[in-house]
Amino acid sequence: MILKDFNSNWKFEKENECILVDLPHDAMLHEKRYLGGPCGVGGAYFSGGFYTYTKSFMVPKEFINHSIHLHVLGAYRNSLVYVNNQEVYSHKYGYTDYFVELTKYLNYGKTNEIKITVDNTLVPNSRWYSGAGLYRGVELYIGGMDHFNINDIKLNTVSLDPITLSYTIPYTSRKKLDVLMEIYDEDKCIKKNKGASGMLNIDATPWDLDNPKLYTFKFYLMDKDEIIDTYSLEYGFRTLEYTTKGFYLNGKKTILKGACLHHDNGILGAKSIYDAEVKRLFILKNAGFNAIRSAHNPASQHLLKACDRLGILVMDELVDMWLYHKTEYDYATDFKDNYIKDLKSMMDKDYNHPSVIMYSLGNELASPTTLDKEGFRILNELCDYIHKNDYRPSTMGVNFTNLEREELNAHKERYKMMEVYTNSDEIVDDYNKIVTRFGYGMAEIACAPDSERVSIDTFKVLDLAGYNYAYKRYDLDSKIHPERIIVGTETMCEDIYKNYERMKKYPQVIGDFIWTGIDYLGEVGIGGYFDHDHHFQKPYPWILANGGAFDLLGYPTGEAYLAMVTYGKATLELASYIYDEDETKSAWRWTNSRNTYTYKDDVIGKDIVVEVYSIYPIVELFVNGKSLGKKEIVNGFTTYKFPYEKGSIKAIGYKDNKAFEEKILSSANESKLTARIDYSGKELTYIYFEYKDRNNIIDTTKEEIIKVSLDGATLVGIGSANPRTEDNYIKNEAHTFLGACMIAVKRNAAHATIKGSDSKDTIDITI
């Protein structure tokens, strides 16, 4: 199969707009956001829409005896594919890929037209920002009439001593053909083998977290000495083992240090581009995380490719809802007719990725439970399908507060906080709001007898018991369910240190995935602190969840420092925030602290809180040279509260009564606009605009408009980490937030120049 770039020069139409775009493309970024926007708080007040993508292309006459397939990597949602005005395929789910054979619909030797319509008019249909359109791009495969079935090629490492590979390489042909497989370590062929299936011993290096070694597999479909078709892929050799004594990667016990990760790429919207996925995974990897959960939908191919290459493990998740709606128009409408098709699509996509280690069948579902026969039937069918077609285990993110609906209603008197009101004081039973009112009480509810009763049969079917916000069950289930292998599918950032200690104490708990690794679009304000007027559901112009160990641009919060200390990536760090006794914390945002000691003049004399994160048992904090005393580090951190004064703070870490390390944060002096290239890949370059003083300290008080112009490059995204903004991510300007904003550009010339300007200065950057 020849893979052709098919992402350029698509005509994009919506209402009265018609422009040329390159894929991947997020159509939702072209929609208006406004107070009362129909996507609501989940979709960041965007609007829905109907979109048409059209591409014309010449098919040479010599291709008449070829097979041609279109691969749509992701279209949100309800897509239809037309070839020369003939409808040839329809697809409902917005997060699974699909293949369309074009062969018999094409006019050879002539210009052809592919049209893909995407219908996202019925909103809200997601609890978070979904994006829309052809947001993951497309591919075109051209092969002979005899060709490999590329989606069915399966490689599996069955042992490491020696490395033994099980392989199946199916093809389509009316006659028997030969299959040649070559395995390359960079440019060197280390193994050749003939045969379409079997077992093979290989002298190679295993893939693991510290050395994610990948090999290139090249497949040749042969008719005697003639090559009929070719295909290649990357693969790494590794084994998985799950026991009540822990999870073993290549025979080595490995605790999953995980983070939940939404599919959007921040200022890029929902667009999945390889460089964008690498950039955010670098952030998590460098902080000590070794795993992600694709919350709450199948991961993109680009994300999995990046995980393979960086050495990050993946829990790939199927869906956020089954039979019951969480939003009015969500996928619960179509799930029952498509769940096996969707699961197959996810598993086919994942099979040859060494990073993928388990499948989650859903998140916080109202089914299956002991009381829900239909949901329980579906659960068994899905698990059976996995067991018949894959070696990976099944799990599910179970939130014990989300009992079967009759159970939920029965407990409304017991849990008054379940009554959540909109701004018009109407009682709402949206589950996302209900569990928010439970907040920290979810761990307690998980231990209730009712929770055990309605979940016990579900966990008997699943290979791994996935617990959302249920760390208090770890001790309980080590006694009453010693046979269970447990994974913390979703946990609070603030519990990361304590949960890591629990995982070391209870080996049957194999890992933990915090909510979330990086802030994301939609579900606005879930992590925002609130006053008496606005709690969980924040009003327009909120656009971000305001959660995550890292903000939307990748800057660390205090929660990131707690993770870094927990996982051995930091020894001593400082963060601070302005103290406000009237604010109420969100359960999904433990601290508002940042790595700064720069505040406006009107904060002088008001209380701030400084957090010290450290591996050292004792720390001491100094403010402008004056000691505030020594304190014990408990669960990775301690805090100091005092009136703010400009200058500097210094923390010293002590061990055995000796000073081992110090860390200093200083207030920024007069600052000016600066620019730096943060990441530059084959497709994207990320540039940060920051206000810094002469000592390279970011002035986090600066909120200025930055305008950009480009020569030789295209703007892909621009924005800040501000959770409450009306800035548009596809315009040529943005406000800084905490002294910074970021742009992503795609170079379309050998050299490109980007200009960034504020009201005083202009900076040129050449890439």
Language-model-detected regions and their locations in the chain:
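Accessory beta-strand-rich segments of carbohydrate-active enzymes
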Residues: 3-15, 43-149, 174-176, 298, ...
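Substrate-binding clefts and catalytic carboxylate motifs of secreted carbohydrate-active enzymes
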Residues: 4-15, 75, 123, 357-359, ...
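An acidic-aromatic loop/edge-strand motif
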Residues: 6-8, 20-43, 94, 103-164, ...
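Active-site-adjacent substrate/metal-binding segments within catalytic domains
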Residues: 32-59, 63-72, 76-83, 89, ...
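Aromatic sugar-binding surface patches on proteins
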Residues: 96-99, 196-201, 634-638, 725-742
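Extended acidic/polar, glycine-enriched regions
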Residues: 107-109, 170-241, 645-646
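Short flexible loop/turn segments that cap and initiate beta-strands
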Residues: 177-180, 210-215, 607-609, 615-617, ...
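Edge beta-strands of extracellular beta-sandwich domains
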Residues: 230-235, 657-669, 760-767
